[in-house]
């Protein structure tokens, strides 16, 4: 993909308002849309590899609604991404908060002009422009853009966030008045008992499902009167919230678990750090999620989980010291004040206490670097990459047709990684010198992990454990013109449109030129659509278009056409 650029600048003459002064006492936020508030996503929703960091406001499945500044402030950042937030604006406010407006279809014209100027200056569609000083002030209620579907959006909506300006932590916007009607209590679908017994949590940890019954905020065990616990036990819960009357399911605001009236685990979604956000894969039973699609929220905290959501005793692990009945109580809450309670009885299982042993097989702890090397593989798991110690596993598989190495299984794909690992795989002798710069590591799904050839190995960073081998990418991207051909008259047509695709390593760059001069090509990754909007830079007359698209291994396709405008 085109490079993202960070440019620090001082803008001296551009203002979106006539006001020269921003109130330093304004803390009263308005909604960013003039629509009845309805959410398709809430803060803390469970998403792949992250908690949702804001509110997704519905926009009637349409683009183009005006987006308003929630308070006085100034534009501190303007960003255009191929994925992610797409077109986004960041406003800093005098009260120490930053508001974020993402997936916009268009910026306010003055912001749009500034962004486009930088795109042309840097010859890049993707730009990330932080502003140092308050040279772009805005007033509360001022239009800053229009809602859209850019970036990694799954449909038209406004993604909206509140952040702490200093720490850049994501804050729950509903704590700042951005609430929506909600009269529904959280719903509980079941619980899981985990028998830890001195072992770090893993996908091998024995677990047992217990059905629940109830509704309207009161739940109990469906069939089992008492749950027997082992020496060290913990629980996980399957639950969610609804927003009635809007509909849909959402994340929870708070999960509390108490033992005999004493809190042993609380998770509260007030705020979180983006650096720690991937630890949702520790908050959830990751293996269960991958195998079944079920989101089990663990009520215990692994040692490598750095999310600041939790307050626990003994990390939420239960160690009963007697043979008496004990009561566990789950209390689930949303920010509208709706709560649900689930009470159940537990006691320790003496027979399991006598038979439990620690295997002491864990050979890598999460808080130090770990290296595994043999003649065919080199692996570095950095400190902080795992959430719990593991017994590292490696095995060698058969070679697949059309590949340049054997298959190497690197631990278990259902063990989550918080940080990337560095993996080097030895190439076969049939990887000829002319193919070395085309080599990539490919996982068990056939997805390229990238890679560079170094001293007989192909080296790359991997974000997940799995099975890897070497392939080469020698096929250039495909360019398909959608509304242009050589000699076509484009009068009355607002833009030139292409579809682009790559077979393996992925699109790295695209460059468009008209009459030899760089032009802005915009790209929607979701639809693989690339386009250029005609503007004042292209005058009526005869022109020559050239589009060059390269993949991540340097394979390049070029499309040329003459056209009349």
Question: Across the structure, where does each feature detected by a protein language model lie?
Answer:
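Bacterial Sec-dependent N-terminal signal peptides
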Residues: 1-27
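Proline-enriched interdomain boundary motifs that mark the N-terminal boundary
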Residues: 186-190, 476-483
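Short, solvent-exposed loop/linker segments at the N-terminal edge
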Residues: 218-219, 225-230, 415-416, 486-492
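Proteolytic processing hotspots in large secreted/extracellular or virion-associated proteins
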Residues: 353-359, 363-366, 393-440, 484
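Proteolytic-maturation and junctional protease-sensitive modules
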Residues: 412-468, 509-511, 518-520
């Amino acid at each position: 993909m085109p490079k993202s650029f960070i440019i620090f600048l001082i803008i001296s003459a551009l203002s979106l308002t006539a006001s020269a002064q921003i109130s330093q006492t304004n803390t009263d936020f308005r909604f960013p849309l003039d629509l009845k508030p309805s959410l398709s996503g809430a803060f803390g929703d469970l998403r792949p590899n992250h908690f949702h960091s804001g509110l997704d406001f519905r926009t009637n499945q349409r683009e183009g609604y005006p987006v308003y500044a929630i308070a006085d402030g100034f534009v501190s950042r303007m960003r255009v991404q191929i994925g992610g937030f797409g077109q986004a604006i960041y406003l800093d406010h005098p009260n120490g908060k930053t508001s974020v407006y993402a997936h916009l279809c268009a910026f306010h014209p003055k912001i749009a002009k500034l962004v486009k100027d930088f795109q042309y200056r840097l010859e890049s569609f993707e730009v990330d422009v932080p502003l140092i000083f308050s040279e772009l002030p805005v007033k509360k209620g001022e239009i800053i853009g229009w809602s859209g579907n850019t970036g990694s959006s799954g449909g038209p909506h406004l993604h909206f966030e509140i952040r702490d300006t200093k720490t850049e932590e994501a804050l729950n916007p509903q704590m700042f008045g951005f609430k929506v009607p909600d009269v529904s209590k959280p719903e509980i679908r079941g619980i899981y008992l985990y028998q830890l017994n001195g072992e770090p949590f893993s996908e091998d940890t024995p677990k047992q499902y217990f059905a629940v019954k109830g509704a309207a905020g009161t739940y109990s065990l469906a069939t089992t009167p008492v749950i027997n616990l082992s020496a060290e036990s913990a629980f996980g819960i399957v639950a969610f919230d609804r927003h009635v009357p809007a509909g849909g399911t959402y994340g929870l605001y708070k999960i509390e678990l108490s033992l005999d009236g004493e809190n042993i685990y609380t998770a509260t979604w007030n705020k979180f750090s983006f650096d720690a956000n991937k630890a949702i894969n520790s908050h959830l039973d990751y293996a269960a999620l991958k195998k079944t699609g079920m989101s089990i929220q663990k009520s215990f905290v692994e040692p490598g989980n750095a999310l600041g959501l939790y307050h626990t005793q003994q990390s939420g692990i239960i160690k009963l010291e007697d043979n008496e009945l004990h009561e566990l109580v789950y209390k689930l809450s949303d920010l509208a004040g709706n709560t649900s309670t689930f009470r159940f009885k537990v006691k320790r299982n003496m027979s399991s206490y006598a038979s439990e042993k620690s295997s002491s097989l864990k050979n890598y702890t999460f808080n130090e670097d770990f290296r595994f090397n043999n003649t065919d593989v080199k692996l570095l798991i950095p400190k902080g990459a795992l959430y719990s110690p593991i017994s590292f596993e490696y095995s060698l598989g058969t070679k697949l047709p059309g590949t340049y190495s054997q298959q190497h299984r690197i631990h278990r794909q259902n063990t989550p990684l918080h940080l990337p690992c560095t993996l080097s795989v030895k190439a076969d002798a049939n990887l000829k010198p002319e193919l070395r710069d085309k080599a990539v590591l490919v996982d068990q799904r056939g997805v390229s992990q990238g890679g560079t050839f170094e001293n007989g190995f192909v080296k790359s960073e991997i974000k997940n454990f799995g099975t890897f081998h070497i392939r080469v990418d020698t096929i250039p991207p495909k360019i398909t013109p959608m509304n242009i051909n050589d000699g076509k008259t484009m009068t009355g047509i607002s833009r030139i449109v292409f579809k682009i695709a790559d077979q393996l390593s992925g699109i790295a760059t695209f460059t468009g030129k008209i009459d030899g001069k760089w032009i802005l090509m915009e790209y929607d990754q979701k639809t693989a659509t690339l386009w250029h909007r005609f503007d004042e830079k292209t005058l009526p007359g005869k022109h020559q278009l050239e589009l060059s698209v390269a993949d991540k291994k340097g394979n390049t396709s070029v499309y040329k056409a003459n056209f009349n405008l």
